[in-house]
Amino acid sequence: MSDIESLGEAAGLFEEPEDFLPPPPKPHFAEYQRSHITKESKSDVKDIKLRLVGTSPLWGHLLWNAGIYTANHLDSHPELIKGKTVLELGAAAALPSVICALNGAQMVVSTDYPDPDLMQNIDYNIKSNVPEDFNNVSTEGYIWGNDYSPLLAHIEKIGNNNGKFDLIILSDLVFNHTEHHKLLQTTKDLLAEKGQALVVFSPHRPKLLEKDLEFFELAKNEFHLVPQLIEMVNWKPMFDEDEETIEVRSRVYAYYLTHEK
């Protein structure tokens, strides 16, 4: 007879309750090395260490190709950032927000869904990688399409006369097909008259690529935001499954959106 069997009814004390949940995976880290630092950058910090949420239904536990491409592009084009107001939607690990701060943005507002773990992680990454005396990054939990006041308050307090954002970053968000209208409405309403939105994405579901691209048709036809393809490049896909779709999944698309004149 085993020790557990000899305990009789008391053995039940050692059974996991039906509602038992295992502890969540611990956060892990990814390193990003800046390879396009220009002399205009406010900081020459080269290595950025990002903490990623252990697991997240909102995909904040991965450093996606689109986020890396976005960071590279921003570092290569400091004129988009320096002295400007920047809004990042769906920031996840907030790499683009960090890059904007290091390039001397006047103010960066880094946002994502108001999930406590996700927002705490964004705060951690910013505090770990942006010098405190820069004082040019704020974070805000935000649901696309909701009241803009909390976002605008961050640039109003620095005395920005424009009242809107010079640059809005949407990195790897267009796979949320049901959210296209909200994303575009938010972008249209918060983008300064001469501002630009940077939209970068990879086709995570190759069969739905056309749905991804409908974002840009919708931007043009319903929201009067003009899409301009920057480029499409091929990088190693995030996942190795399904050889038949590997080429499509390796793509990274980058666009600008501007207000129709």
UniProtKB/Swiss-Prot annotation:
Signal sequence annotation: none
GO biological process, one term: rDNA heterochromatin formation
Main EC class the enzyme belongs to: transferase
GO cellular component: cytoplasm
InterPro entries: EFM7, Methyltransf_16, SAM-dependent_MTases_sf
Record: residues binding S-adenosyl-L-methionine: 64, 90-92, 112, 144, 171
Any single Pfam family the record assigns to this protein: Methyltransf_16
Single GO term (MF): protein-lysine N-methyltransferase activity
Domain of life (superkingdom): Eukaryota
Cellular compartments annotated: Cytoplasm
E.C. numbers: 2.1.1.-
Classification via PROSITE patterns: SAM_MT_NNT1
Coiled coil: none
Keyword Cytoplasm in annotation: yes
Region of interest (Disordered), ranges: 1-27
Keywords attached to this entry: Cytoplasm, Methyltransferase, S-adenosyl-L-methionine, Transferase
Protein family per UniProt: Belongs to the class I-like SAM-binding methyltransferase superfamily. EFM7 family.
Functional summary from the UniProt entry: S-adenosyl-L-methionine-dependent protein methyltransferase that trimethylates the N-terminal glycine 'Gly-2' of elongation factor 1-alpha (TEF1 and TEF2), before also catalyzing the mono- and dimethylation of 'Lys-3'. May be involved in rDNA silencing and in lifespan determination.
Miscellaneous: Present with 7280 molecules/cell in log phase SD medium.
Protein name as it appears in the record: Protein N-terminal and lysine N-methyltransferase EFM7
Organism: Saccharomyces cerevisiae (strain ATCC 204508 / S288c) (Baker's yeast)
Lineage: Eukaryota, Fungi, Dikarya, Ascomycota, Saccharomycotina
